[in-house]
Amino acid sequence: MDPERCAPFSVGPAAGPYAAAGDEAPGPQGTPDAAPHLHPAPPRGPRLSRFPACGPLEPYLPEPAKPPAKYLQDLGPGPVLNGGHFYEGSAEAEEKASKAASFPQLPVDCRGGPRDGPSNVQASPGPCLASLSVPLSPGLPDSMELAKTKSKKRRNRTTFSTFQLEELEKVFQKTHYPDVYAREQLALRTDLTEARVQVWFQNRRAKWRKRERYGKMQEGRNPFTTAYDISVLPRTDSHPQLQNSLWPSPGSGSPGGPCLMSPEGIPSPCMSPYSHSHGNVAGFMGVPASPAAHPGIYSIHGFPPALGGHSFEPSPDGDYKSPSLVSLRMKPKEPPGLLNWTT
């Protein structure tokens, strides 16, 4: 070998772990006291690999890594875990795992390993799946079958004809609770079953009770409509001559008009708007019938009390028209002469 081509190595203060056991530490000048026979450290990475290996460095070069032959001999077709194959080469492990997970296990002929080609996988797994005795979802109920059974129990609605409804209504007008014999006879006439006739009467009674309750509620809300009938009150169009005779001309024989009470106590149209037979107004209000005793009664229409002691003759017509509500409506249309008295 050529010693000039070899790279010089400087020994540091510490020899390191690769120093020999019999070597001594170097002196302060960096030279050993005795022949040290030191060996340099082997290269650890690319930083030390730039020096060429020559001479005594060759035995210390690392050898290329080789896989152990013993490990390759023990290695099987699949990965090894704790001394046994993981899932490909061990069927017992798969059975234990499937039993622990409570899932049905497929037969071995129905499945292929991940390393098998597409030719080894069966195209139709139907017969293999049919061999399973455990259902795919044993804990879930079959909701589709339950829905079918419920839909079958539902009965169709019965459509009654006009003749059947008439016959049923006739019997219902007679009695709301027909006995079994009457229901059977009615079922024969209407071509229905006795059960359908009974159900129809139950529904008809419920409908009748509902209408009765609704009618009572309406009567309780509007009691005036049942106590008084508006049609009995006189209308204005039925007495057109009453409007002309209410206010006679100033030249007539009765200056007071029909709004004054006659001595006989017959009420005038202005005092009694309703056609009730109460006698005179004074008697109806609970006061004596004498017009001279209480002249203040005539102040209702604005007449002075002095007119209470005078007696007036009835109107020239001689007949008293039936009073009505129109007299109250005509009250604001009093003649100017009567309005001047009140002021």
Swiss-Prot record:
What coarse category fits the chief subcellular location reported for this protein? Answer: nucleus
Record's CDD domains? homeodomain (cd00086)
A GO molecular-function term, please? DNA-binding transcription factor activity, RNA polymerase II-specific
Q: Which UniProt keywords apply?
A: Developmental protein, DNA-binding, Homeobox, Nucleus, Transcription, Transcription regulation
GO cellular component assignments: nucleoplasm; nucleus
Q: In which tissues is it expressed?
A: Predominantly in neural crest-derived mesenchyme and in lateral plate mesoderm. Prominent expression in frontonasal head mesenchyme and in the first and second pharyngeal arches and some of their derivatives. High expression is also seen in the tail and in many derivatives of the lateral plate mesoderm including the limbs, the body wall, and the genital tubercle.
* Residue ranges that the Swiss-Prot or TrEMBL entry lists as coiled coil: none
Localization per Swiss-Prot or TrEMBL: Nucleus
Q: Which residues fall in a compositionally biased region of kind Low complexity?
A: 12-38
What Gene Ontology biological process does one annotation of this record name?
regulation of DNA-templated transcription
Which parts of this chain are annotated as the region Disordered? 1-122, 309-343
Top-level division of the source organism's lineage:
Eukaryota
Q: Annotated DNA-binding ranges?
A: 153-212
Looking up SMART domains in the UniProt record yields: HOX
Biological function:
Transcriptional regulator with a possible role in patterning of mesoderm during development.
Q: Which family does it belong to?
A: Belongs to the paired homeobox family.
PANTHER family referenced in this protein's UniProt entry, alphabetically: HOMEOBOX PROTEIN ARISTALESS (PTHR24329), HOMEOBOX PROTEIN ARISTALESS-LIKE 3 (PTHR24329:SF578)
The protein here is known as Homeobox protein aristaless-like 3
Could you tell me which species this protein originates from?
Mus musculus
